Structures are given as C-alpha cells and as structure tokens.
C-alpha cells in the first residue's frame, strides 16, 4: 500500500505516456491492481481514468472504463467534485496526441470522447445533469482567450454536440446553460466594447 501511494504520481504519469506504449501498458497494469485492491485514492485516479477513456487504444480505453465504473459504483458522490479536473485532464491528454484536439473520435461512426463517461453516470439523473452543467459552463471564455482556450472550447463543444442524451431534459438543460452563458458573456463583451470606444 505504501509503495503504491509513494509512486502514485509516476504511475499516473506513465499511464498517460503516449510516446512509450510499453511504459503506458505497464503503468496501466499497476494502476489496475492499485484501484481494484483499494490502494489508491479515487479522487487522485479518476481524472487519469477519464483521460484514458478518450484514448485511441481500445484496450486502454476499455480498461479505464472498467476501473472508472468500479470506482463510480463505490464512490459516486466523491467523484462529482472532480468533473472539471477530469475534463481538463482529458483535454491535456488529447493535446499530447494531436496539436488541435477535437472532442470526438471517428471509428465506424462519430462519437463524443466523453460518451463512455456519460454512460457510466447511467441512471443517476442528478449526476448526469451536474456533468452537463459543468461541461457547458467550461465554454465560458474571457476577452483575452488564447488559442489553447479556443481549442479547449471546441473540445467541450464537440462533446456536448455528440453526446447521446438519454432524455429530452438534458439537451434542454444544455440549451438553457448556453443561454445564460451567452447573456453573461454578451454583457461582458458589450461593456468591453463601450470602454474601448
């Protein structure tokens, strides 16, 4: 237990190491053992698992989804507070794969990178709605946004556009949150323009 906790950060870093697949696979084996044995803290591990769920490697993707489901079944209420961190970790992981990451993957069909995560939230309505709220609110940008901010916004928007929503309430919630965001950002932009002129 102490050994796993001591080397948790290097293992989590190794799991996301796309330049060296053997290191990535070995680290994912260690992570799997740590999670299933209860030797790692779920709050520390889940952002990495969510990032791996967006991997192009189907073995890593399914392994991460299995571990995420395992942790979600035991610690669902704890994991809600990590939505923002998980989304950003996934984006950073995608940035390590490509210069301008998108929020979808195209196999036989196009699907949102966060579809697996959304499916894990499953029947828990409040968790799904909290997830969608967090995702939508991350589209907020300041007037001084960078190219990386725009890429992140596009990554989030792709996921929102391509998620397979379960009930009508969910896209309606996204639309409502976007309206609120538009009102706030529109007012902010108007005041910036007025100050400059």
Task: Give the residues covered by each predicted segment.
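Internal alpha-helical scaffold/solenoid segments in large eukaryotic proteins
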Residues: 5-75, 80, 153-157
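Long internal repeat-built scaffold domains in very large eukaryotic proteins
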Residues: 36-37, 47, 65-197
């Amino acid at each position: 237990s102490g050994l796993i906790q001591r080397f948790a950060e290097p293992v989590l870093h190794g799991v996301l190491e796309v330049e060296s697949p053997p290191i990535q696979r070995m680290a994912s084996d260690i992570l799997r053992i740590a999670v299933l044995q209860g030797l790692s803290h779920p709050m520390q591990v889940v952002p990495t698992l969510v990032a791996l769920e967006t991997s192009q490697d189907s073995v890593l993707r399914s392994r991460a989804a299995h571990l995420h489901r395992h942790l979600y079944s035991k610690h669902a209420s704890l994991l809600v507070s990590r939505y923002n961190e998980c989304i950003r970790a996934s984006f950073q992981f995608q940035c390590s794969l490509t210069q301008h990451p998108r929020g979808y993957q195209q196999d036989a069909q196009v699907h949102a990178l966060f579809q697996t995560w959304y499916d894990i939230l499953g029947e828990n309505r409040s968790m799904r709605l909290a997830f969608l709220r967090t995702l939508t609110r991350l589209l907020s940008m300041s007037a001084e946004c960078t190219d990386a901010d725009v890429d992140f916004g596009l990554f989030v928007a792709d996921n929102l556009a391509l998620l397979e929503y379960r009930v009508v309430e969910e896209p309606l919630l996204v639309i409502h949150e976007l309206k609120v965001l538009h009102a706030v950002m529109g007012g902010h932009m108007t005041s910036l323009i007025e100050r400059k002129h």
